[in-house]
């Protein structure tokens, strides 16, 4: 092909647009099947059938395997089965208790979606057995790799390490190549049809049980002019897809019937004391939730006497918020707050509420935070009537880049949130 003329850029773009439109239904169908059908058990078979003492099993997934995945697997292999089972018990019991505390009937569910990073297979194997004892079969799928199904650079599902975070970030808006009003309708119609085809399986799906990780080196992306970016019109179209697809999911996997749990562990990249840190995290994850439930109830009973809560930062933190609480007619019988212990969010705990929007406002300042694998420095969100009206951070040299970074990765192009 040395003498062949290269196709024009527009020709290649048109071919890719046609491909995406032609195969949208097939891609959505496959993705939704993976999300609810336990018979699609590629990952389950690796977990349950492999010799986990031989780390070659990690390469059976087809994912990038780094020192983190190998290090976690080696460390878990050094633990006793009793220790592994204890970790799995904390994780699975958090899921079960989440249903109880949410007054939801777990016996109506038949599947649970397990999400994890490679290396945690010993724990996941034990968890699968415990979930099965509850009557739940595992549904485990790979993070989305096709642009039709991806959500920015988020990795939802089982995953290895990210070989090149900048590459993932650069390609987070590749849908800008083909996103238009016709595709919006095509994708939503494909999603609706796929869920209708799998509605029986979707109805008995219980929701996700997530094993997250922390300790990786900070990644601060660069803005590349060559990367695809959504136009203003496409941003609105993406918001429409996100909103409508969420409603479709909720019709078939009802929000008032499903639950979740999240637990997190360090990875070797955190430093030389990884084993010690991991052991301490295990202890934290198994704190006596009944004790903290009582402690947090004292906080709730105090806050329930208030109409307003003022939150101020210190030590250079500029947070200055005032939060308007709902009035309670009978303080002894009513409360504004949820006493959340080690169920859906492990470890304990948190006390949270949904405030009155009118009168709730101010500045939330976080010096450093990680969201979906991205670092935000000096993140500031300004609220008025409970909505974000202004925002900035210090990741980039220009204010335009900083605002765009927040719009893309926190606000997701909503005008207000």
Ranges and model annotations:
Residues 326-328, 367-369, 384, 393-396:
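Histidine- and/or cysteine-centered catalytic micro-motif in compact active-site loops
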Residues 391-417:
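Dual-mode signal for accessory low-complexity, basic/Gly-rich regions
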Residues 376-393:
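Active-site and channel-lining beta-strand-loop segments
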Residues 1-358:
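Active-site bordering "gate/hinge" segments
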Residues 342-380:
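Conserved AWS/pre-SET-to-SET junction and N-terminal core of the SET lysine methyltransferase domain
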